[in-house]
Amino acid sequence: MARAPAQARGSRGLNCLARSQQTGIPAQETDDLFSTCYCEETEEDTAHQEAGMTVDCLSIPKKKLAQSQKKINQFINSKMSTKANKELIRCFILSQIVFGKEHWKCAQALANLAYGYLTLRGLPAQAKKHAEKARNTLLTWKRNTTSDKDKKEILETLVRLYYTLGVAWLLQNHGKQAYIHLQKAERNMKELKELNNGNICGIQVSEKDLTIALGRASLAMHRMNLALAYFEKAICDVILDKGHNTSELISLYEEIAQIEQLRKNHKQAIQYLQQAYSICVSSFSEVSPQTAEASALLAKAYAMSGASEYRDAVEIYFIRSISTYQTLGSEDYETLTAIEDFCTWLIENGEKQEAYRLLKSTLNSGNFGDCGKKVAETFYNMGSICFAKGELGEAIELLSKCLMIQSLVYGSEHIKSIETKSLLSLLQRWRLKETLEKNRKEASGGETFQKTVITLLQ
């Protein structure tokens, strides 16, 4: 058999590379793919060709695709998000080569990449861009496919795609758009359930995930009752599946408590947070970051109620939270946040001296490393307390320290630095005015005394 010209032999590899370049994926991601697509000729290949055998150029990309799909799960399980995302890009490029750009499996790979950008990288803009590109192809194949097996996969992919779009819109503070797309995910999930005789176990986006996302989108639209209904459903589903004491309920109780607080239903919010706290203690022990956070949330819920009978509970749970964080040697930011929340409550309840003492002892401990933002806030709060008490000198000293840290952390032109500087300048003018007034009075008093003495002597 006559040997093919060199240009023809290399054209397959060049075509494969051209496809990858059309996707908009960075060029460096395609380097390895070119070598996998390009069927480099060896003496053995030549022998096969001479024997009348044809080399299947797609066999190598198919093998690479299977390997890449396996690697994705391995990287995700190992919490290697960036590597997993790179493999998703590789899968998409290989799917274009193996199936063609208009095939639903290629659109599925692109939808998977979009979901990866959302869940692995936290990049909603990129997630939306890729999901929108994949949508039309998947919808066309959904209408035209006759295979139940393919339709099930397409429906599952559409659930994932619309969920990705919904959550991406939600992260960009567009509640209505988020809700519309999540409803589409819900409709496709219902269709998948019917086609699968009610069994949808093991799909990537679960019913619970979708229900929670719908609840959050409802909350973003300020539809409190609807949000409440979704979270109640999510809680019921989790309890039916895993019981009353599963740690999965903690975040759900905390979120539904937030909704109840917005509805001014403080007693119900407190009940939910008490349940979250109890599960934290039983699941993680009393000295754990989860329990410390739950304790702080419960303290704030008691404080938000404004009820005098909860005053002791506020102190108890704030002190538990702070003590737990300090025992664990937790992140300085978390400890300072709990202390500042407690001090805010103390100030609101007229205990400025106690708040000041606590803030001062916190700073004097010197265990807060590089938490510049929180330390600056602490100095600001202490300065505000001193100002409220009429101690201008102490307030100026504390606000000066706050401004110094803010200028280092944010820069002197940042709004926080500018606001602190304005307040500091105002206090300094007041102190100067007070000093001048005092001196004037003293001088005036001295002159009056001299006149009185002279009069008496005469």
Swiss-Prot record:
SUPFAM superfamilies attached to this UniProt entry: TPR-like
UniProt keyword tRNA-binding, yes or no: no
Keyword field: Coiled coil, Cytoplasm, Cytoskeleton
Protein name: Tetratricopeptide repeat protein 23-like
Gene Ontology CC: one annotated term: spindle
Keyword presence, Cytoplasm: yes
Cellular location(s): Cytoplasm, Cytoskeleton, Microtubule organizing center, Centrosome; Cytoplasm, Cytoskeleton, Spindle; Midbody
Coiled-coil segments: 175-198, 246-278
Organism of this sequence: Mus musculus
Pfam families named in the record: TPR_12
